[in-house]
Amino acid sequence: MQTIIDAWFVQGMIKATSDAWLKGWDERNGGNLTLRLDEADIEPYAADFHAKPRYIALSQPMPTLANQPFIVTGSGKFFRNVQLDPAANLGVVKVDSDGAGYHILWGLTEDAVPTSELPAHFLSHSERIKLTGGKDRVIMHCHATNLIALTYVLENHSDLFTRKLWEGSTECLVVFPDGVGILPWMVPGTDEIGQATAETMQKHSLVLWPFHGVFGSGPTLDETFGLIDTAEKSAEVLVKVLSMGGMKQTITRDELIALGKRFNVQPLQSALDLYP
């Protein structure tokens, strides 16, 4: 008989967190990951739920997420340990009927709680649900090394970061034509950075936190991981190019436009118009 550990969403979280740790993006308890589920996903595993689910109030109501279940990583938990003990490091939670709080249905044992970045995740989920008609289900935050490095040497401007990442690898414009948003430095784990991230997610599926990390949104764990992985690969190329004296030639504006036409995507116009 299968248990909730065998469920696709638990196995998917195990793989995503393990892969992210192996990439070097999630040292210690760095990074967090949430996946929005349907009632039909969790209903077969009701026998595994806690007998008395703990209730935790949200710092602000999230009516868009009312009655929605999620699987989330825990606060202070190490991604490298998720595969060793999923129930201690992950949790299935369900937002209540008015969006005021949530019950921990499974996991997060020994009084553990969801990630401290839950406000940023839930606010971003709310915005991406509206923007994508419910298609986006994943929010991933990690400390992608080369993306962080670039925030120290490039002007922290959305159009510039977008253009440079598009130029760093041909596939980038196809994978994130909506570009990369970037915030000012802010204290993590607060409603303020959560709100700013969510507002930026109205325009971009990738949001950089300077000197800290990146947020990504997508329809599946694979798509969201791949989104960040693609941007991080381009950032790695750019770090190497900058260390070798900078670009001598690159993909031009006209070539980027041609690329968008070939793959039927609409590139962020302000990034295209930044320079020839």
Curated annotation (Swiss-Prot):
Pathway stated in the Swiss-Prot or TrEMBL entry: Carbohydrate degradation; L-rhamnose degradation; glycerone phosphate from L-rhamnose: step 3/3
Cofactor note: Binds 1 zinc ion per subunit.
Subunit description: Homotetramer.
Taxonomic source organism: Klebsiella pneumoniae subsp. pneumoniae (strain ATCC 700721 / MGH 78578)
Name this polypeptide is given: Rhamnulose-1-phosphate aldolase
Role, per record: Catalyzes the reversible cleavage of L-rhamnulose-1-phosphate to dihydroxyacetone phosphate (DHAP) and L-lactaldehyde.
Cofactor(s) this protein requires: Zn(2+)
Family of the protein in this entry: Belongs to the aldolase class II family. RhaD subfamily.
Disulfide bonds: none
Residues binding Zn(2+): H141, H143, H212
Lineage: Bacteria, Pseudomonadati, Pseudomonadota, Gammaproteobacteria, Enterobacterales
Top-level division of the source organism's lineage: Bacteria
Known EC number: 4.1.2.19
Cellular compartments per GO CC: cytosol
GO molecular function terms noted in the UniProt entry: metal ion binding; rhamnulose-1-phosphate aldolase activity
InterPro entries referenced in this protein's UniProt entry, alphabetically: Aldolase_class_II_sugar_metab, Aldolase_II/adducin_N, Aldolase_II/adducin_N_sf, Rhamnulose-1-P_Aldolase
Coiled coil location: none
